[in-house]
Amino acid sequence: MITGTVPAKLAEIIDDFQDLTEPDRLQLLLDFSRELPALPERYSDHPELLEQVVECQSPLFLTMEIGEAPGHPVHLFFSAPPEAPTTRGFAGVLLEGLDGLPAAEVLAVPDDVPDRLGLTRAITPLRMRGMSAMLGRIKRKIRESVRDEA
């Protein structure tokens, strides 16, 4: 059994996907792909600061900043090529659903969130594992950061 709480922004995105037919879900994923912002210069000029998520079928790199403010807000940054719309779309979903949330809320997100989007029949299992790996990598990096502070 997977436990955890889906933050409100991410729950709304999941509901949006679940309210659509399968072809429309794919279109919504493409919309998220197109909306994924470019990296800020501090990362685009220094790609060595990004970590590759090797489980993704297409090249995807991520990094994050964990704030000093109460709750340690998490800010996510992704880089994926335009010719990888599925990967970019998954990154866009995670960015919109999790960016700015306190670290504890991100850590509490259930691991099955990718499956809740209703794309398992339309997207290959390997690509679905890529989104799961993105979420897992985000959580691991948060845990490492919190452990380093202790």
Stretches with model-predicted labels:
Residues 3-50:
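Extended low-complexity intrinsically disordered regions
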Residues 25, 58, 86-91, 102, ...:
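Amphipathic alpha-helical interface surfaces
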Residues 33, 97-98, 138, 142:
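Generic structural signal for hydrophobic core residues of well-folded globular domains
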Residues 43-66:
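Structured beta-strand/loop patches that form or line metal/cofactor-binding pockets in enzymes
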